[in-house]
């Protein structure tokens, strides 16, 4: 996770990950929350969009993230919750509806997920860069292979879908 950029971020878009049924964040979600808190302190004027709906047996990811960010000292007036998003594309479409085109945003998510999120936010017309929440331990070859095989088709699918939605005027940009 690197925060060295001097470029301004007007919005921080935090992509969700399932919470535990009792409302506590999973380790993956906790890393994203910690990275978002660091980014919020780095860019104190930036607003945060936390995104993610409820799971089958867990509360909305956005609510869990917002509560934890407030516990990290991030003001509630800076946090916008999107509790309807079911996946990455839903989060990007919510960002495109809320944030004006050309706005500088930082996508906070897991490191393996950054390329897809940044590409989609850029297709949505936002000036995006990513901040990957690093794992607490090394992923290893099996983990790397799993996430690579998972993300490659997802990137291809989502990019094609985003380009089609944009061409049809249905991407939702502000």
What annotation goes with each model-predicted range?
Residues 2-146:
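A structural signal for short, hydrophobic/glycine-enriched beta-strand patches
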Residues 174:
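Active-site cores that bind ATP or allylic diphosphates and position pyrophosphate for catalysis
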Residues 141-171:
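A transmembrane-helix-recognition feature enriched in membrane-embedded lipid enzymes
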């Amino acid at each position: 996770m690197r925060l060295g950029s001097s470029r301004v971020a007007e919005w921080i878009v935090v992509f969700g990950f399932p919470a535990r049924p009792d409302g506590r964040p999973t380790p993956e979600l906790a890393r994203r929350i910690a990275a978002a808190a660091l980014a919020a302190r780095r860019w104190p004027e930036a607003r945060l969009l936390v995104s993610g709906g409820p799971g089958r047996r867990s509360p909305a990811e956005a609510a869990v993230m917002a509560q934890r960010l407030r516990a990290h000292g991030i003001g509630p007036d800076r946090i916008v919750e999107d509790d309807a998003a079911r996946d990455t594309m839903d989060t990007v479409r919510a960002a495109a509806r809320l944030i004006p085109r050309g706005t500088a945003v930082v996508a906070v998510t897991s490191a393996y997920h950054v390329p897809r999120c940044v590409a989609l936010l850029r297709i949505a017309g936002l000036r995006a860069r990513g901040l990957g929440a690093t794992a607490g331990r090394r992923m290893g070859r099996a983990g790397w292979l799993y996430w690579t095989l998972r993300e490659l088709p997802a990137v291809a699918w989502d990019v094609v879908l985003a380009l089609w939605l944009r061409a049809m005027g249905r991407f939702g940009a502000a």
